[in-house]
Amino acid sequence: MELIQITEEEFDNFAENYEIKNFYQTRSYGALMDRHSFDDYYLAMKDESGNYKAATLILIKKELLGYKWGYCPRGYLIDFNDFNLLETFTKLLTQFLNQRNFMFVKIDPYIIYKSRDKKGNVIPGIDNSKIVDELIHIGYEHTGFNLNFENLKPRWNAVTTTNSTEDLFSRFSKEIRNKIRKADKMGIEILEGDASSVKQFYSLVDKKHSRKLNYYLDMMEILGKKDMIKLYFAKLDTAKYIEKSKTLFEAEEKRNNEINQELEENINSNNTTNIIKRKMASDILLNNCKQNVINATNLYKEYPSGVIVGASAVIKYNKEIFFLIDGYKQEFKRYCPNHYLKYQIMNFYRKEGYTRMHLNGISGEDRKSVV
């Protein structure tokens, strides 16, 4: 076996045909990070017949006195269950890096440690604890089961698969389902952006991360060449908001009148308690509908063409989507734009045949007892 440096094209050819591939081990991601404080190496291990058996992108950070450290994002591209192959690759990689003044290299492999439910409890399914044990055995230092976002990539990720629109919707909590319905009633619609939309997108997400505008401009330029990134916006269509608000008001007004009629017809009855309760509930709902009509009318006067209220960036690769970052205008929070945005994006890609949806990193604070 021999470890060699390969071209970006050779690496991409290997990565594209590798079974367990991921977005972070691509030429495109390497090119992006090359513009943002890292250098990039593309390495492969080949056998005596010249066949590549493993490969990795290494991002390189230079330190003082010529020393460096490396990071293999979600790497390597290797069969982690083949311990002999893994050990050989590690030895060759160590030799390669030592010759080039590397102090260390970090890895966070794209493997699931154990299957867990949404509360973090271990459930029957995947168990890759033997891989972790083997990595430690051959010289890797395990930095621990972090709970938050201490590492370069989050440990905890919310991932879902779905078979139908109904199945997808049912997977959300009752609270989120209600917010999605609310956004729909208030005239939120989804628009797709392009390279010219990046500045508008950035204005909605700049407070959520330290990345600057240039990072997203570069991302759209580099990943856009391979159709790996999409920008989506949530727009409050104020004309539609008025229309829907009036429709809901008229429907509730009709229902309220019917309850009034029912109450008049049963005024001398001893069985009016339930009718009165329904009347009180309808009065509250009718008043809310009226306020929505007033609010929609005022918004239409201010934004006759509608207003962008939320945005989300999505990475698409290998029939998976990754929600990279999202944001919304705080003053329009009550319209639940990002809940609706995420749901509609997920439903769109489900119909396009995408099988896994990564909802981005989550904290493990509520899972301290199950690390």
Q: Model-found features: residue ranges?
A:
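A conserved beta-strand-loop-helix scaffold within acyl/acetyltransferase catalytic domains
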Residues: 4-49, 55-66, 139-151, 163-166, ...
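Short catalytic/ligand-binding loop motif for oxyanion handling, primarily in non-cytosolic enzymes
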Residues: 63-68, 80, 112-117, 241-243, ...
